[in-house]
Amino acid sequence: MRKLWPTLLAFAALSAPAQAEVLEANDVLPPGQSGYVSVQGVASGTGSPHLTDQIGLFSNFEYKPHTFNQPGETEVPRAGVSIVRDSYGVPAITGDSDYDAWWGVGYAVAQDRLFQLELFRRATSGRLSEILGSTYLDDDLIARRDYYTDPEIDSMLAEIPAELRSRGEAYRDGINAWIEHVSQPGNPDLPGEFVALDDLPIEPWTLRDTGRIGVFLARTVPSGDGNELPNALALEAIGRRGFDLLHPVRTKGRLVTVPRSEGRFPAQPGRSRRDERIGARRTRSFLADTDLSTVTDTAAQVTARTGGAPGAGLRAVLPQGGSFMWAIRDQARERAYLFNGPQLGYSIPELFVEFELHSPAQPNLRGVSAAGVPLVGIGHNDQVAWGFTSGLSDEDDLYVEEVTGPETYRFRGEERQMDCRDETFEFRTPPTDFPDLIESQGAPSGSVTERICRTVHGPVQFTGEGAALARRYAIWGRELETIVGLTELNDAQRIADVDRAMRHVTWNENVIAADSNGDIGFWHPGLHPLRPKRWDERLPYPGDGRAEWRGLLPRSKTPHVINPEQGWVTNWNNPPSAGWTNGDGPARERLSGSLHRVRILQSLVAKAARRPSFERSSRIVRRSGTTAQQFPFVDRRKLRRAKRRASGGGPEVLSALLAWNGDYARVDAAGTVDPGVATWEEFKDQLEAILLKPVGEQAAVLAGETGLSHQFDITNGESLALRTLGTRAYARAAQATAASLSARFGSPDASTWREPRRMYEVGAMGAGSSPDLPFFDRGTWEQAVALGR
C-alpha cells in the first residue's frame, strides 16, 4: 500500500488541471521609462539610457515583455529591499516586508522621475510659478481655488485605512532616501533641472504631496470640468433648434459598451422626457433673465491668458485624455485576453512610470502608475488584468449664484456669507528656458495675493456684477476613497473581486478586467449626481436653491456587465450604456452617435472574438491605430451618387475617397501618404461648414474639435454632417474640397495631393529631449495580457 502512494500522487500531478495564471503579456511605454537628465546633459537633453529606448518598439508595433521576473541588474539600496532593472530599465522591487517593498518602489520611482515628482507636487499645490514663472499663475490659482487647503488634505489622508497610510509612508520614505542621496555635494545622480532652475535644496517628500496628486488624478483625468458656460453662450447665439441639433440630451444611434441586450442604465432614473422638455424651457427662461456678460468676460480673459481652457497649463503637466481597451472571452479554453491603451499624449518622461512589486501582501504585481502614487493604476497580478479609459460622464455642475454683496449671496431665501481666504502666489523669472515648460518669461519676480471663495455649492470660479459661478463636484472631499478601491483591484483574484472593488472607487474611470478563469467585465463607476428633474443638465443651474441635486445614483445602478453573451467588451470613451445621457458634453466626441470612433474597435474586436487568441487580440491596434476611424463606415453609395452629381473637381475628390482604404500611416518612397488622407480631412471639414452655415458661427463651440491624440477622428459637427446631409451637400463639399486642395498643392490632379505622414511632437516635463513619434492613434502606454490555463 505504501508503494502505491507515490504512483497515485504522480498520476494526480499529471492529471491535475493546469494552473490558472498570466500566460502571455507585453507592453510598451514610449519614449522610455526614465526621466533622468544629468547636470551635464541639460543642454543636450541626455542622461539615462532609458530616456528614449522604447521609441523603436512603438514605431514598429513591437513590445517588450510584461511578465514577472525579467532578468537584469540587481541593486540592494538597503537591507530587505532588492531592485532588479530589466533591459529597458523597468524596476522589479522585492521587499522582505510590505514596508520594504513600497519603500523600494518610492526609491526606484525617484531614481527615474525625481524632477517629475517635483513638477507634480508643485502643479497640484499651486506652486509651479515659483520655479517656472508668472505664466503659470492662472494654473496655480486654479489648483488652490478648485482643490483643497493643507488642513483639508491632511484630514482626508487621516480617513484612509491604516495599512494604506503605512504604504504611503513607506513610499514617501523611499523617495526621501533618494533625495538625501542626490543632495550630497557633487553627487552625479542629481537631476540637472534642479540646478538649472535653481530649485535647491530639494524639499522632502510628504504624504500630503502624494495626497494632492491622488486628488488631482481622481478628479480631473476621468472627466474634468463641464461645458455649461460655453453651452449657454452657444444657446444664446444660435437658438434652441441649433442647440438641440448639435447637443441633444441623447444622441440617436449612439454606440454603447454594455450591450443593449444586457441591460439599460438610466443616468437619471425617474426623470421623464416631459420633465426634460419642461426643464429645457425653464432653464432657457432663467438664463434669459440672468446677465452673465461680466462673468463671461472674466472667463474669456483667463482663457486668452492660458491659451485654452482655464487650467490648460496644469493639465499639460497632469493631462486629461481619451483611451481605448477591450477584453475577449475564450469560454471553450477558459481564457481571456485584455488590451488597454490609455491615451494621455506623449512626453519625456511620460505621465506613467512602470514597475513590478513582490511583497508578502502582494506576491506579484506589475503595471504603471503616476509618479507619486503608491499603487499600480493599470496592470496585472498573476490572476487578473485590468485597464482604464476616461469615463467622461458629467459629475459636476455649474451654479449661478445671486450675489448680494462683495462676499455674500442668496440661497433659499437667506443671505449667506461666502467662505473666503487669501492666497499668496510667489513667482520668479526662471534662470533657464525649457521650451515645453516655459513658453515665455512673463513678468519678473514678485508675488500676488488672490481672494478665493466658496459657496454652498463649491469653489467660485468666476465673478461678475450681480452673479458668480460656483462649481459643485459630486466627488468633493471623497477623491482619496478611490485609493481603497484601486488597492482592492490590485489584490483581486477573480472578476467578482473587481466587481466589489468598483463599489469603492469614487472616480469616473471606465474599467475592463479579465481573469484567469476566462471571465471578463466592464464597469462605469463613480459618484453620479441625481439632478433636479425639471432643469436642463446641459446648462448652468440657478444657485438660489431651486435646482439642487436629489442625491447620488446608487452604485448598483451604475453601468456594468460581466461576461456578456457576445463574448467581448470594448470602450473608446464612448457612452457606457443605453439610458445614459450626454450631460453638458464634457467631451464633445461623446455626441457623435453611430460614427463614434469606438465603432472600428467594435467591428475588429467582434471579428477577433470568433476565433479568440492572444495574437488576434493584439493585432487589432495595428488597424485601429492607423485608420481614420470613421472612414470604413461612410456610406459609399452616397459617395458614388454624389460623384455622378458633382461638378468642377468634385468627381476627382470623390474618386480619391472611393479608392482609399482609410490608412493614414502607410507612406511611399518619398515619405508621403495616400491622397485620400488630405482629401478626407478637407472633405469632412467642408461638409461640417455646410451643416453649420445656416446655424451660425457660434455653433462651432458645440461642433467641437479633434484632440492631439485623435488627429484623424471626427468632430461632433462632422459626424452630424456625414450622417444627416444628402447627396447634394456631399457634391458641394467635394467641389469645395477640390478648390481648396488644388490651391494648397498647386495642382487639380488628386494624385499629387500627398502630404508627409504626420508626426507627434513629444512634449517635455523637464530637460529631456526626444525625437518626434510617428502619429498613431494609440496609447501612451499599451499592455496586452492573456490569462487562463
Regions found by a protein language model. Give the residues of each.
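Sec/Tat signal peptide C-region and signal peptidase I cleavage site
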Residues: 16-20
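Alpha/propeptide regions of enzymes that mature by internal proteolysis
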Residues: 482-504, 601
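Hydrophobic alpha-helical segments
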Residues: 461, 469, 507-608, 679-691, ...
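Substrate-recognition/specificity elements adjacent to catalytic centers across diverse enzyme folds
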Residues: 21-337, 342-348, 360-362, 367, ...
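Second-shell loop/turn segments in exported
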Residues: 101-105, 150-166, 470-473, 484-489, ...
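Bacterial N-terminal signal peptides
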Residues: 6-15
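Compact, glycine/acidic-enriched structural inserts
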Residues: 120-122, 361-441, 486-489
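Terminal end segments
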Residues: 47, 51-54, 582-647, 728-789
